[in-house]
Amino acid sequence: MAGSPDQEGFFNLLTHVQGDRMEEQRCSLQAGPGQNPESQGGPAPEMDNLMDMLVNTQGRRMDDQRVTVNSLPGFQPIGPKDGMQKRPGTLSPQPLLTPQDPAALSFRRNSSPQPQTQAP
């Protein structure tokens, strides 16, 4: 849909004015005296150590909050006697579960009473 020449002129003027406003708001960043952007390396080693400590602490907190589930509806434990196996490199166990027979699950889902229809 093409606009009238007046509309085109208005939008061209608007674009020009808005573009000038954007240019006026731009600023250039310059390194201060004695600061060479190329000489600045990555994060300080102290910051790396802090971040590593934070990641490890949060990971341990998440492991502490994990719940061991002995049985879930529709699943049966397999594997070791208690149904648990330690994951390598962690302190928390990982449950080993296998789904039950799908027919048994569908039977349980459909076991609610069904409305009975009466024959005429």
Curated annotation (Swiss-Prot):
Comp. bias intervals (Polar residues): 108-120
GO molecular function: guanyl-nucleotide exchange factor activity
Keyword Repeat: yes
Phosphoserine PTM positions: S111
Record Pfam families: GoLoco (PF02188)
Spans through the membrane: none
InterPro entries: GoLoco_motif, Pcp2, TPR-like_helical_dom_sf
Ranges in a coiled coil: none
UniProt xrefs under SMART domains: GoLoco (SM00390)
Region (Disordered): 16-120
GO BP of this protein: G protein-coupled opsin signaling pathway
Known role: May function as a cell-type specific modulator for G protein-mediated cell signaling.
Protein known as: Purkinje cell protein 2
Natural source organism: Mus musculus (Mouse)
